[in-house]
Amino acid sequence: MKPNRLLPLVLLLTALSAHAKDFIIYDRMDYVGKPDLTADKLSKVFLVYESELVKPDPTGKRKHGVLNEARIRELAKQSRREGYRTISTDIESWFAEKDGQLLTPDELRTDFARMYQIFREENPRAFISNYGMPSEHLHGIRHYRPNVDNEAILAKWRQVSKRRAPTAAISDYANPVFYITSPDLVQWEKDVKTAVDDIHQRFPNKKIIGYIWPQYYSATSSPYFKQFIDPVRWRKMLEISKKYTDGVIIWSDKRDENNQIVRWNDPRIQATMKATQAFIHANAKEIKVEGLQKY
């Protein structure tokens, strides 16, 4: 019997296929004049900020406020009406102390469970999580502790993240923050890997969709504050994100490092998009697009 010279190639292709995974890129950039980017293989995510989800406690007892259930139900109906599946809520203040009050992990879990329930009641397709689940922004914590050794930084990160675990457990996916604070991609990748490894250990069945930003993190003490990331480095960030996660939400506000409004035709964001499109083209078979499914 003659040896099958194609067999090694077939086995190699099979192995490569087995390691390939879908990767999804959600667009939540807020640059003025941005068009619909679905044709460029960017998907849509329904992002809702805290100001629409939380209202002052009528009794005045709870300093962090309470769920605005009527508004949440309206938003949930809107998400279904407009065809969204993936939803990211952005409640951040509940995880910090406010006027001497600190919500317990059980209180957090109960309120998030209620909010998630409302979304799922009104939008059965809802795939929902909250910004920063299940852990704090490790790379940001490192930025604010430049002279602290790595083990102490990791210990602080684990400590401040611990209260999020019960809420993360009931979230549909992990939604960590991977904003970069400086051009140091080596350290950024290490921090991404550390956060992802932690998620895999604690929540092995959850998809990981991280937040990234075409600008450097808005740390006021940073010399790179909100400057645009160069396109070569941005492309590498996408490649690293694909290596470790299931997808990213590309987020931005409207302003640059000089507090100037950024328009879509700005050469800086166009360079970012060119790098993003090149990344998508190079990984076309693995880029998943989640379109709107209107009722």
What are these regions (language model features)?
Residues I212-Q215, A219-K294:
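Substrate-binding cleft of secreted/luminal carbohydrate-active enzymes
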Residues Y116, R120-R158, K206-Y217:
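Aromatic-lined carbohydrate-recognition surfaces of secreted/lumenal glycan-active proteins
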Residues I91, K156-E189, D253:
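Aromatic- and acid-rich polysaccharide-binding/catalytic face
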Residues A20-R62:
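Boundary/entry segment of secreted carbohydrate-active catalytic domains
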Residues Y179-A219:
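Glycoside hydrolase catalytic-domain groove-lining segments
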Residues L11-H19:
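Hydrophobic h-region of N-terminal signal peptides that target proteins for export
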Residues G33, A70-A76, E151-A165, K190-I199, ...:
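Alpha-helical scaffolding within the catalytic cores
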Residues Q78-P105, D172-I180, G247-K254:
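Active-site groove signature of glycoside hydrolases
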